[in-house]
């Protein structure tokens, strides 16, 4: 899972993959778009948005 740009449905799919059964915030906290779509984010950073 390399650092990558993740926007829209790709971001949601990545969150499902990373968070699994824990789930994630339905409305992600502010910052995930800036971090992962405008910038790049890692799997470790995505885990911060899991429940």
From Swiss-Prot:
One of its GO terms (molecular function) is hormone activity. It is found in: Secreted. GO terms for cellular component: extracellular space. SMART domains: IlGF. It comes from the Eukaryota. InterPro entries: Insulin, Insulin-like, Insulin-like_sf, Insulin_CS, Insulin_family. Disulfide bonds join 7-37, 19-50, 36-41. Keywords: Carbohydrate metabolism, Disulfide bond, Glucose metabolism, Hormone, Secreted. GO terms for biological process: cellular response to oxygen-containing compound; glucose metabolic process. Insulin decreases blood glucose concentration. It increases cell permeability to monosaccharides, amino acids and fatty acids. It accelerates glycolysis, the pentose phosphate cycle, and glycogen synthesis in liver. Heterodimer of a B chain and an A chain linked by two disulfide bonds. Belongs to the insulin family. This is Insulin.
């Amino acid at each position: 899972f390399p650092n990558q740009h993740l926007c829209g449905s790709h971001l949601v799919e990545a969150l499902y993959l990373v968070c699994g059964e824990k789930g994630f915030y339905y409305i992600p906290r502010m910052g995930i778009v800036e971090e992962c779509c405008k910038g790049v984010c890692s799997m470790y950073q995505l885990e911060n948005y899991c429940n």
